[in-house]
């Protein structure tokens, strides 16, 4: 493999050389066309170039089917049969809008915003789940030089109030079911004058808001769409603020990251130039939160490619949650999917579950084909397509629509085993590394140089990087290989956090470098391997450091684990794991190997000592297979009978662990596990 990063300076004391993409050593890219300098220019340029081609597709809900069954639950220490309801969704086929259609809609929405009194320079918050209408409303704002403010629809009252108060928004787009979350914030926020809500809302929520704020304009989206004909754009300059993107807030109140139009055009340009293999013939499945920089950036990148975006919902991604129709993946049949590690682990475990239920002959055929293809890919030899046709295409057709060409994983660490497995069975999985502060990505694997290693890829041509010595863990930027804290600089880098002087001084240097807080290792090929975050490097009782995210990414590959939080007490020698078990697999194990009744409650299964031992044994097996040091092997496990969700506050909307909240919630169980 050719070297993919090039040093453009000499190393200094305590820091490495500065590195850039080997194909762009002399400059950092800022735009891909002379007429593209803002994110609205990206939109307008694509409309001119692709016209009547399909740009976006979405589905309508036809009917919600509710099924109720009796389940066993422990209530006040006694087992009781209680009713539990499941919802299944019947959806239409995809409805498509052309590039010309979406441009017309965006400028109609822009005219409506103007009629409602919103003007150039105003801030407009998008507080809603991902949809075509979210992005088109954003484009409407950008066409009139308004700044968009993003907030996760799972943010909750405190975080929402913080984003509204700090940014001073005048308008908002939301969903009817979220109006109730706005009731208390509206008592304090006087700047918010217009709320546009899509889909049905409860009359009591509407009435309450009108009583609190009688002069506030509360508009149904259906009415909003009809308010105005298209208006002329009043576009911004490159240095103007495109968006204030609130992070998901895993360590306190979310920070508002200020991203200019120049920042966003730089990241779009970098991906377009770095991944020329993706074209206007590709189809991107959109289901991650648009309030997350990864999704926001890649939907705009897809528009620049001239690809088609198909909007999906996490609840209807797969066929199992649908009735009288296929799920979003099998209906849209994407060629490109972007996801976070939690999604890819779920996909891998789904494939493994079906494989383990197959006959011995089919399993043998699968694994023979798997290891053969792995060898061919490792040595860049021909023949993989024969194995795809004979074995793997059937799996792709069943789960992903059969057209996937590339997947991308970002957001946090993914197990190398999962990347390797899905790259062989489905399609090449490109690993990326980035942050909101760098407008989504600093590194992405280059498809032309794809391999099965565990690096986060090569530098994008809009970013330069250096490694700086890190005392935590004794990482040396002059070592072999070089290791240290990752510092980034370039045109995609934010100017800073909104109203956060202290954090800005801590995170950004006077000469333009951003201290990421992440620790990386540079390979001889010029690829970056992420080791961990500085704050997740924990010194144990014997003085040695362990990397929590590294352990979690490996242990999460267990078929018994749905989610995991590794905790290391500095007064102890080893860490322990707080685990959300994979219920179907663990229930089967509890019945067959722990002697529990099939009717045992889920709480009983999770608290059973034999079940815990079986889960512990599997984690130790995985740790040893990865040659973990003794201090990296789990001391004990805590099995919890609830999921980690944004709704209960145990993960952020971006699926990042809320470590402190998890530790506080399960403190009693953690103390007991350490005491055993």
Curated annotation (Swiss-Prot):
A single BP term in Gene Ontology: long-chain fatty acid metabolic process
Top-rank taxon: Eukaryota
One GO cellular component term: plasma membrane
Pfam families, sorted: AMP-binding
Binding site for ATP: 246-257
Cofactor requirements of the protein: Mg(2+)
Residues spanned by motif FACS: 511-560
Reaction catalysed by this enzyme: a long-chain fatty acid + ATP + CoA = a long-chain fatty acyl-CoA + AMP + diphosphate
Keywords tagged on the record: ATP-binding, Fatty acid metabolism, Ligase, Lipid metabolism, Magnesium, Nucleotide-binding
Keyword Lipid metabolism appears in the UniProt entry: yes
E.C. code: 6.2.1.3
MF (Gene Ontology): ATP binding; ATP hydrolysis activity; long-chain fatty acid-CoA ligase activity; myristoyl-CoA ligase activity; oleoyl-CoA ligase activity; palmitoyl-CoA ligase activity
Top EC class of this enzyme: ligase
InterPro entries on file: AMP-binding_CS (IPR020845), AMP-dep_synth/lig_dom (IPR000873), ANL_N_sf (IPR042099)
Function as written in the Swiss-Prot or TrEMBL entry: Esterification, concomitant with transport, of exogenous long-chain fatty acids into metabolically active CoA thioesters for subsequent degradation or incorporation into phospholipids. It may supplement intracellular myristoyl-CoA pools from exogenous myristate. Preferentially acts on C12:0-C16:0 fatty acids with myristic and pentadecanic acid (C15:0) having the highest activities. Appears to play a role in the maintenance of cell viability during stationary phase.
Record family assignment: Belongs to the ATP-dependent AMP-binding enzyme family.
Domain remark in the UniProt entry: The FACS motif is required for catalytic activity and substrate specificity.
Name of the protein described by the UniProt record: Long-chain-fatty-acid--CoA ligase 1
Species the sequence originates in: Schizosaccharomyces pombe (strain 972 / ATCC 24843)
Upper classification of the organism: Eukaryota, Fungi, Dikarya, Ascomycota, Taphrinomycotina
């Amino acid at each position: 493999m050719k070297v993919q990063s090039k040093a453009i300076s000499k190393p200094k004391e305590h820091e490495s050389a500065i590195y850039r993409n080997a194909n762009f050593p002399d400059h950092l890219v800022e735009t891909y066309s002379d007429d593209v300098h803002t994110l609205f220019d990206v939109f307008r340029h694509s409309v001119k170039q692709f016209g009547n081609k399909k740009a976006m597709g979405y589905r309508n809900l036809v009917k919600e089917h509710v099924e109720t069954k009796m389940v066993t639950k422990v209530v006040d220490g006694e087992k009781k049969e209680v009713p539990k309801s499941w919802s299944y969704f019947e959806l239409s086929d995809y409805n498509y809008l052309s590039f010309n259609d979406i441009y017309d809609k965006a400028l109609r929405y822009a005219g409506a915003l103007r009629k409602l009194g919103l003007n150039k320079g105003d801030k407009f918050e998008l507080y809603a789940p991902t949809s075509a209408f979210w992005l088109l409303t954003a484009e409407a704002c950008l066409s009139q030089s308004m700044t968009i403010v993003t907030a996760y629809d799972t943010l909750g009252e405190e975080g929402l109030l913080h984003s509204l108060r700090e940014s001073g928004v005048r308008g908002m787009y939301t969903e009817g079911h979220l109006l109730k979350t706005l009731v208390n914030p509206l008592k304090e926020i006087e700047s918010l004058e217009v709320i546009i809500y899509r889909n049905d809302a409860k009359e009591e929520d509407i009435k309450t808001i009108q009583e609190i704020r009688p002069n506030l304009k509360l508009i149904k989206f259906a009415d909003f769409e009809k308010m105005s004909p298209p208006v002329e754009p009043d576009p911004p300059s490159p240095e103007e603020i495109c968006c204030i993107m609130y992070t998901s807030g895993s360590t306190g109140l979310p920070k508002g990251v200020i991203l200019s139009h120049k920042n966003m055009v730089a990241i779009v340009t970098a991906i377009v130039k770095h991944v020329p293999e993706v074209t206007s013939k590709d189809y991107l499945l959109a289901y991650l939160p648009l309030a997350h920089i990864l999704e926001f950036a890649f939907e705009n990148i897809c528009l620049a490619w001239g690809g088609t975006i198909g909007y999906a919902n996490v609840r209807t991604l797969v066929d199992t949650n649908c009735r009288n129709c296929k799920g979003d993946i099998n209906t849209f049949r994407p060629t490109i999917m972007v996801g976070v590690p939690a999604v890819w682990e779920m996909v891998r475990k789904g494939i493994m579950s079906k494989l383990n239920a197959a006959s011995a002959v089919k399993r043998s055929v699968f694994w023979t084909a798997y290891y053969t293809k792995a060898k061919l890919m490792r040595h860049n030899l021909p023949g993989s397509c024969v194995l795809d046709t004979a074995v793997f295409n059937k799996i792709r057709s069943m789960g992903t629509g059969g057209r996937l060409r590339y997947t991308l994983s970002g957001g946090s660490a993914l197990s190398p085993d999962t990347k390797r497995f899905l790259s062989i069975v489905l399609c090449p999985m490109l690993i990326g590394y980035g942050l909101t502060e760098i407008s989504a990505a600093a590194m992405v694997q280059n498809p032309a140089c794809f391999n099965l290693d565990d690096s986060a890829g090569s530098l994008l041509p809009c970013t330069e990087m250096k490694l700086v010595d890190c005392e935590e863990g004794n990482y040396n930027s002059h070592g072999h290989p070089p290791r240290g804290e990752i510092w980034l600089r370039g045109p995609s880098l934010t100017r800073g956090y909104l109203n956060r002087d202290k954090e800005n001084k801590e995170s950004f240097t006077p000469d333009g470098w951003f201290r990421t807080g992440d620790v990386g290792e540079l390979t001889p090929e010029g690829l970056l391997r992420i080791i961990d975050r500085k704050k997740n490097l924990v010194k144990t009782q014997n003085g040695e450091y362990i990397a929590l995210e590294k352990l979690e990414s490996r242990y999460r590959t267990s078929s018994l684990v749905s989610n995991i939080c590794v905790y290391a007490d500095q007064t102890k020698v080893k860490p322990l794991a707080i685990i959300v078990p994979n219920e179907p697999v663990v229930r089967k194990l509890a019945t067959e190997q722990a002697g529990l009744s099939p009717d045992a409650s889920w709480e009983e299964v999770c608290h059973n000592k034999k079940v815990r031992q079986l889960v512990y044994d599997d984690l130790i097996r995985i740790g040893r297979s990865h040659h973990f040091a003794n201090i990296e092997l789990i001391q004990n496990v805590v099995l919890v009978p609830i999921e980690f969700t944004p709704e209960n506050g145990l993960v952020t909307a971006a699926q990042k662990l809320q470590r402190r909240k998890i530790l506080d919630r399960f403190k009693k169980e953690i103390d007991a596990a350490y005491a055993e």
